């Protein structure tokens, strides 16, 4: 069979019969990526990476380029969809113990970090008020690095402040990183197919597997259709639902935006960053909030892979989900009285649940279930 490998990749791949809708998000992410690369290319064709022209070039795209408004909206809304899907995909991995497939999990978290970097660079490109101040705030985090901080920041900016060289290099990075994402995704899929998908029971029933196509591919197609329908509803009716009003005015280095809130995608991480008053401490907490996911296979103390039969861990899991939603909400609010303390408590409970309560609950469940 000459095309054996390609067939094995999608057609003849043996998959458990009982995987649920939570397993459809991988193919949805692949579709998001394809959409982002396609629309991104057409946007890049009309974009000008110059601080005096960037904002105008996007206005020109939306107004004058045929279907430019569609490309721009699809790219912006598609990015938010990408993040919604990836967070659900990770939550599924946490719930069903998919992180026990270590190589796949590590490549996935690396993908998440690359994706967040790409989204940040993309957010800077329109050169609106929020773009400019987000760039200022986030790049200034590098100054928290001891000894090298200031030199690193100057090197990244290409000068002593955010200026034309900064925008040019951010555009270059935003263009090249998706290719890294594509290669990492391919690696992610290849590594997954080494061991095969998990399933809600957390078992590996080799005797009860069916081919991916046509059984699961049609199920994937259903969720894909729903996602594309959502995109096509949001695009014409609520195109600016994920945008920030401040980003509709051109960047002005002299007037700071009211509250520099990060994009919807990274609001959860931003809340953790600013809940710590110390600069270096905040940066470390920000990094730790994502890097802690690398530790998940080490923190797994249960004898059962999945949380399906572990009620205590389930309660903790849904508390963690709620916690992340609270962090996301706080991250989009101004830094004032109630939000500061809420953010600090939510950040604390985030790390507490992952690093302490999950392993302890699993040990207790082992005892209760006499495993």
From Swiss-Prot:
Subcellular location: Mitochondrion inner membrane
Gene Ontology annotations of biological process type: mitochondrial electron transport, ubiquinol to cytochrome c
Chief site of localization: mitochondrion
Binding site for heme b b566: 89, 188
Gene Ontology MF terms: metal ion binding; ubiquinol-cytochrome-c reductase activity
Main function: Component of the ubiquinol-cytochrome c reductase complex (complex III or cytochrome b-c1 complex) that is part of the mitochondrial respiratory chain. The b-c1 complex mediates electron transfer from ubiquinol to cytochrome c. Contributes to the generation of a proton gradient across the mitochondrial membrane that is then used for ATP synthesis.
Protein name (database record): Cytochrome b
Organism of provenance: Loxocemus bicolor (Mexican burrowing python)
